[in-house]
């Protein structure tokens, strides 16, 4: 509610400042988490991987046949490659460069992005740290839920103060993405769907802009209600991880926005029906593949949203 609230009234201006604060916190937390497992490498890299392999040999393999998400090259490499291309074309990613005050800052922006993103990628190793700490994924005889493993690792290895900072950093990672999605989804719905239906080709003026701003705020409220409902469903009926729930919706959005964004960047005078048809088709295909269990990768209790998104 807090995030939806300040995005509703602050918009992109608020997001610039909150994202900057969140990014600094996340970077500090990433370094703390990576450093927390330094002692696992005292015997060298080979000892570290041997320790991981002794817990579960599948953890050191390229693919894991027993996993519902990492079974073969198609899931691990191809799907992630396609989704990666779609991600960099998303409105909430592209608009980051538009927030630069000067065009000359673009190269510096890209350099910082690559450095920080590389550090964030290495945070995946913290999952190995947690698995070494909890080899059988239990604590005090109780099974640890998938979404609670990192929290348990933080509680066990850090003081209350440091643990609080880390938890704030983990929350910031979700909030920064949520802000971008709120901005891009609400703007897309308002500008590309509602405006053409209600106002046609009416030229921009102060009155119309004010009306669209109010419409956008209503859209954000509706999105908040939907988000609260789905979050409650995940809490009541968890399916492996909240990450699966998030990926299912986000990848559907990625698929829907991919073609329209590319057309907007590289083509001129595109018929309105073209991006609309592409978006509608992508959404229908994504959810049909996922919920209709149309492939071997999207059957069973846990299904891979990346496969549905790739096909869409």
Task: Explain the meaning of each model-derived region.
Residues 1-312:
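Membrane-embedded helix-loop-helix hairpins and adjacent transmembrane boundary segments
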């Amino acid at each position: 509610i807090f995030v939806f609230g300040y995005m509703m009234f602050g918009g992109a201006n608020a997001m610039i400042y909150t994202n900057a604060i969140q990014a600094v916190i996340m970077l500090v937390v990433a370094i703390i988490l990576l450093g927390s497992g330094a002692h696992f490498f005292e015997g060298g890299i080979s000892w570290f991987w041997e320790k991981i392999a002794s817990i579960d040999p599948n953890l050191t393999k390229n693919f894991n046949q027993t996993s519902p998400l990492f079974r073969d090259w198609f899931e691990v490499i191809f799907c992630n490659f396609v989704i990666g291309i779609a991600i960099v074309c998303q409105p909430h990613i592209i608009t980051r460069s538009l927030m630069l005050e000067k065009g000359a800052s673009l190269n510096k922006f890209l350099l910082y992005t690559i450095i920080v993103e590389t550090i964030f990628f290495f945070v995946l190793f913290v999952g190995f740290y947690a698995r070494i700490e909890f080899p059988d994924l239990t604590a005090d005889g109780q099974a640890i839920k998938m979404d609670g493993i990192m929290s348990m690792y933080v509680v066990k290895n850090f003081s209350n103060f440091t643990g609080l900072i880390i938890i704030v950093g983990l929350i910031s990672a979700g909030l920064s993405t949520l802000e971008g999605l709120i901005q891009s989804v609400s703007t897309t719905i308002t500008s590309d769907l509602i405006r053409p239906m209600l106002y046609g080709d009416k030229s921009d003026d102060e009155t119309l802009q004010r009306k669209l701003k109010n419409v956008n705020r209503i859209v954000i409220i509706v999105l908040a209600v939907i988000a609260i409902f789905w979050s409650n469903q995940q809490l009541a009926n968890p399916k492996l991880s909240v990450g699966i729930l998030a990926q299912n919706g986000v990848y559907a959005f990625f698929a829907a926005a991919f073609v329209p964004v590319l057309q907007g960047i590289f083509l001129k005078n595109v018929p309105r029906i073209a991006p609309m048809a592409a978006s509608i088709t992508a959404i229908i295909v994504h959810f049909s593949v996922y919920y209709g269990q149309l492939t071997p990768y999207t059957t069973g209790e846990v299904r891979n949203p990346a496969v549905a998104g790739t096909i869409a």
